[in-house]
Amino acid sequence: MFHQKPTGVFPPEMALNAEVIKVLGKAGYLWTVTDDVPFSCCYGSVPFNWVPKQKQSEIAVFLRSNFWSNRISFNSVSGREFVEILEKDLTSWFRNQDGYLIIWMDWETFGHHKKGFIESFINPFFDRIAESKKVRLVSPDYLLKKYPRKEIDVPSGSWSTSASDFRNENYWPLWKDPNNEFHKLWWELTDLILKIKGNIKDEETLTVFDKAMYSCQTWQFSMGNKILAVEGLKYFREIASLKEAESIKKILDIIDKLEKLCQQG
């Protein structure tokens, strides 16, 4: 992984919209990835023999299979059994044509969230894949060379956006829910912090901003883990102490409100 030039990028939480796609395209990436639920809500099905390309952009957008990825993440299935199910079900879906399936999840799924899952899933999965005559592992770059791209509007969403969330235009329910007071205040705070960050050049100081602005704070609050949600606010307080922070009072006021929300039952 190190000293390589990646051709694609995985956005945090697979949170994607047209604006992010545009930024990634300008950065020179050839592909990105997001969940297939919003796409399925819009178009009724998900492609297996062509790759979506966002309109007015050259970047391809792979669609991670929510069904198959979560079948690994949230079920007790062995690696060998999973490959055998894939062989059967994909043959039916692809109708004996070549096709592709994107399976994607956090690496922490294996061994951290699911103890012993490297031994029970990963190792036998790779062993069974090596034996298979129907299924093989390939890279996104390989898929870009093999399958045509079709221009289409890729809808906004994340890998935690349900069909119901999408229909209610709540595209990032665990991180930017318009009905969640913690989320609204956190993003108001983040907007203020980003204005300060633009004037910072010192690398050590910039690491404080990186620690402050990450998706776990809003996610933890959404999950009811308020102690962990409030933990990250200490970095915002550290930023408020910088000379460059002209909006110190407003920043501290918002932090106080966020902490009070975390103290509520």
Annotate each language-model stretch with its function.
Residues 1-4, 25-46, 50-60:
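Acidic, His- and aromatic-enriched active-site or binding-groove loops in soluble protein domains
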Residues 8-16, 144:
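Short, solvent-exposed turn/loop segments enriched in Gly/Ser/Thr/Pro and often Arg
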Residues 13-16, 35-38, 66-68, 107-109:
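Active-site-proximal loop/turn and secondary-structure-junction residues that shape catalytic pockets
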Residues 17-26:
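Distinct, well-ordered alpha-helical segments
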Residues 19, 41-42, 70-73, 111-113, ...:
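Short helix/loop capping segments that flank catalytic or ligand/cofactor-binding pockets
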Residues 48-59, 63-66, 77-80, 91-265:
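Active-site and substrate-binding clefts of carbohydrate-active enzymes
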